[in-house]
């Protein structure tokens, strides 16, 4: 499932020690992500995107800032934020403190607002009392932003039609609150319905679908009906859960590793993830690379994918994940076929 764009390209040269610090050398050894079009929106995003789900409010602020700075220095321009309820028991807000912290870190990082593509979510959690405009205004206020570039709409609750969602996001675009919209975990028939509703209402088509996609979970992204629906909408995939919650980072291949899969298979889902993690680690060793970037490269090799979303708690994790860019550009046909076979029987 390769893409001709990904069959060429080499890592940049390494500068001399006398001109750059060791830290900068490490940055230069990582190939910067290219830009890919986000559907038909006219927005180009980096091949990897930095997420924030249950991250920044759980780590020290200087650690979060270091993560953002590393992403900026390595060429990531696509950031994903979301409102969710506090789980630490210490946040000053019951919901949305994640957005407050994100905004503070963003401003401290030195990024200019127009340098990044910023995504957030419409959860419809308080609909119908709170419509899309009210929900987004709350998020913008907490982040201290005037607009976001991309709003992902979660699957609607009972009573909220796709047609109504299309009209509401159309209003947000007209008001300058968002530049484009996408869908979050929508099934293929709902994506197809959205495309038809947009055509009828004269609203921009959804440009992206954020969907779980990994060596463990290839459906629905590779399903024929999803491919058809995305094609009709002219939408790209933003791949999420590509490391399967850490299962595909390679940590379970280490002796004495602890985590949700370290005890083997507590259920069928975890058993499959454990088997895939072992296969992936073996292939990574044969290819002389690491599990995490190889797992991300798998998603990047799908031409439907505009960007792979990942989260990091350390700058080194950002750098390690960016190695996927060069892998996707330089793996030969045999290696790609071996990668495609990882987990195929799980």
Residue spans of the language-model regions?
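N-terminal binding-site loop/beta-alpha segment at the start of enzyme catalytic domains
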Residues: 15-114
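Beta/alpha (TIM)-barrel catalytic core signal, keyed to glycine-rich beta->alpha loops juxtaposed to Asp/Glu
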Residues: 23-24, 156-346
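Active-site groove signature of glycoside hydrolases
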Residues: 143-159
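Short, acidic/polar
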Residues: 60-71, 128-143, 191-195
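Acidic (Asp/Glu)-rich catalytic clusters
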Residues: 39-40, 73, 103-113, 137-144, ...
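Short Gly/Ser/Thr- and charged-rich N-terminal loops/segments
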Residues: 3-10
